[in-house]
């Protein structure tokens, strides 16, 4: 039987970029990868579910490897920061104690939570843990996603559905979800729901459309707030100014 590859990993280097952005000598790479695997679950466990959609870890300067910059993308900035930044500062202290390095955390707000596969999967898992009927939960999630403007969505759930004695698999989909089209912006997430009947697996696959030339994932998804858009536009202007400077000097 053929096995399906992870849609996120399949598009790395084509339309998607890595969530850990750094480089170093070969001897240090395993150690730094291990650090990333420690940092990510620490951040996820520090906050409640359906709060953080993406974590980016950056070590941009090779000479200054004692400094780490972490970008958190969230729909609930108030929970991430806390009163007087208490939650954010306590998280920084935990990470610095864990890896013994200086840490800076940047927070970016996402506005369309029903278009992000991670948040949709976590929300479904939370409702299943609260003993909601799984078919109603899936239909509600799909309707909200389609209203927010996605091209297609597919949700797969496995386990003892509805408390049945035998585990089975059920899925529901609407719209177009082309997993083999590499230029299609496919957002994939997996989450577990721990219920009294056992563990249920939830997979969410969302199609945001095709990433055409001179466009990025941010253009197809349109999930970020004005703060992220300003940062992206400033970066575009910076690179454009560099190109114009090179042309004028040549």
Curated annotation (Swiss-Prot):
**Mind listing the GO biological process terms from this record?**
translation
Keywords (alphabetical) are: Ribonucleoprotein, Ribosomal protein, RNA-binding, rRNA-binding
* Coiled-coil segments on the chain, per record: none
Q: Which Pfam families does this UniProt record tie to the protein?
A: Ribosomal_S3_C
List the record's Gene Ontology CC terms alphabetically.
cytosolic small ribosomal subunit
Record's superkingdom? Bacteria
Q: List the disulfide bonds.
A: none
Q: What GO annotations for molecular function exist for this entry?
A: mRNA binding; rRNA binding; structural constituent of ribosome
The signal peptide, as residue positions, is: none
Keyword Ribosomal protein among record annotations: yes
**Segments forming domain KH type-2:** 39-111
* Family assignment from sequence similarity: Belongs to the universal ribosomal protein uS3 family.
Assembly with partners or alone? Part of the 30S ribosomal subunit. Forms a tight complex with proteins S10 and S14.
Task: Say what the protein does.
Answer: Binds the lower part of the 30S subunit head. Binds mRNA in the 70S ribosome, positioning it for translation.
Protein name according to UniProt: Small ribosomal subunit protein uS3
Query: Origin organism of this chain?
Result: Ziziphus jujuba witches'-broom phytoplasma
